[in-house]
């Protein structure tokens, strides 16, 4: 996840003039092996069974994937290169408060495992936005799809360009050579191999990411006298943060902000994002999908701990050794690379391994974006208009879409090179859009009275609020001339060799206390998803109730998660009818034998699919015209 990176400004200097070290031949070989092996894995799955591929195999891996590869792919999808660079730099400059983000992983993965996955899996979806049509109508589905496409197109270009830019500034590694190499390799194996190739390359790239970070921790700790010494040094300098229980949502990082605001951010990524939902649905069973979500939890904790340890080791290292002039003036996204090149400069091959680790994060994120964008474009925008599309043409079109989005990614990377400081705004758009989409799905899942008009108005209002606060915050920070010193204004924690200029805040603001709109814009970025999703739900409910709710409309029973029935059953019958609760209201027609409709090339699911849906837990209760989504049991 790239949460630590969303506000990191990018240094736009190109060339090798400020490089600490350059790549050796061995480093280039190690880095090249990453690209070659990723390409080989993709081509293997593309060539295997060539001529017998189906659209389901290309987009959904034939729904036969196991728990472990899906779990590692879920982790790799948003463990981007920007996060690998951002989290250690965050710890180095501000202390270990960021580590409490790990507390949000529990609910952030438990809720998708027991709410989103059962509903999505039992509806046998391909695109997450099919749910919106089943629950509301086609217009809501298209709105959700277009919003997701906008989000991912912006982000994937930045995710490709940003690490290449940092690498170029630090090592002199050619900027556009790395951009083109990554873009072309990723494009080929994603377009030809489909989701199965993406998942298995994600597995390989996840192992490379862990290995690269582990090498830095081991070598760095050994160089300064062990992890015990690292902990002692960082503790003495005040880098080990206590629990900040300040409830103020305008404080950037507190325990509540990280542990609870982070839950909504996690839900927007692991609950409703198409890239992740697609992996859940590619599992061979619902149980495997739930287990894969569980397995992400320890993997995320390990990834977070490794990133934080790199930040602590980097601090202890520069407490013992002098910093180069380049590092003292480095942009935040370059700190880790400068440290790695300084630490491993006498060990040929290891700098190349860390760069391979860095670009593994980019490859996994970008390939997931290509594949998910091709899937939603095919399922949500093309097939509904061309229901008679043959299997052969559908396969060619799916591959063509993935390839086309790859070209768009390269184009966005080129545009990013001309954005300058606006690059930060482009990165933040990813977070701005995730919250409203989460709110839209929650509105449909938990509130049966919500209608299509309420969903659309709620989504548009949520997006408006998201961009207002997000862009306003960025503009407010950019206009600030002075940045506060880190760690509550004290520079006493810094090693003697570190200047305050080298650790200026990631989210600068003026030293004077903000007032009015500036105070409003200073809302912690980790609360963005919570604020924006709540806006969608509240506005959507108000509009729905004012326009009659779901009275007179059919409600697909498989699209509602049965949490509220148990709570609302405690209310008087008159209140339940007013809320249009279908278990007691006769205003909502429910056909007794209605199974969720799933369109596939214009054809409804047959009786075999209906039997399979019944086996998966969507069961009809004879005593009442409702369906109950059974609890997931492991």
UniProtKB/Swiss-Prot annotation:
Its main location: membrane. Glycans are attached at residues 488, 497. Pfam families: SSF. InterPro entries: Na/Glc_symporter_sf (IPR038377), Na/solute_symporter (IPR001734), Na/solute_symporter_CS (IPR018212), Sodium:Solute_Symporter_SSF (IPR051163). GO terms for biological process: biotin import across plasma membrane; biotin metabolic process; biotin transport; iodide transmembrane transport; pantothenate transmembrane transport; transport across blood-brain barrier. It is a multi-pass membrane protein. GO terms for cellular component: apical plasma membrane; brush border membrane; plasma membrane. It is found in: Cell membrane; Apical cell membrane. GO terms for molecular function: amide transmembrane transporter activity; biotin transmembrane transporter activity; iodide transmembrane transporter activity; monocarboxylate:sodium symporter activity; pantothenate transmembrane transporter activity; pantothenate:sodium symporter activity; sodium-dependent multivitamin transmembrane transporter activity; sulfur compound transmembrane transporter activity. Keywords: Biotin, Cell membrane, Glycoprotein, Ion transport, Membrane, Sodium, Sodium transport, Symport, Transmembrane, Transmembrane helix, Transport. Disruption phenotype: Intestine-specific knockout leads to premature lethality between the age of 6 and 10 weeks in around two-thirds of mice due to acute peritonitis. Growth retardation, decreased bone density of the femoral and humoral head, decreased bone length of the pelvic, tibial, and femoral bones, lethargic behavior, hunched back posture, and decreased biotin status are observed. It comes from the Eukaryota. Expressed in the intestinal mucosa, liver and kidney (at protein level). Expressed in the colon. It catalyses: biotin(out) + 2 Na(+)(out) = biotin(in) + 2 Na(+)(in); (R)-pantothenate(out) + 2 Na(+)(out) = (R)-pantothenate(in) + 2 Na(+)(in); (R)-lipoate(out) + 2 Na(+)(out) = (R)-lipoate(in) + 2 Na(+)(in); iodide(out) + 2 Na(+)(out) = iodide(in) + 2 Na(+)(in). The chain crosses the membrane at residues 23-43, 65-85, 100-120, 142-162, 175-195, 207-227, 255-275, 295-315, 350-370, 403-423, 427-447, 455-475, 526-546. Interacts with PDZD11. Belongs to the sodium:solute symporter (SSF) (TC 2.A.21) family. Sodium-dependent multivitamin transporter that mediates the electrogenic transport of pantothenate, biotin, lipoate and iodide. Functions as a Na(+)-coupled substrate symporter where the stoichiometry of Na(+):substrate is 2:1, creating an electrochemical Na(+) gradient used as driving force for substrate uptake. Required for biotin and pantothenate uptake in the intestine across the brush border membrane. Plays a role in the maintenance of intestinal mucosa integrity, by providing the gut mucosa with biotin. The C-terminal tail is important for biotin uptake as well as apical localization in polarized cells. This is Sodium-dependent multivitamin transporter. It comes from Mus musculus. The lineage of its organism: Eukaryota, Metazoa, Chordata, Craniata, Vertebrata.
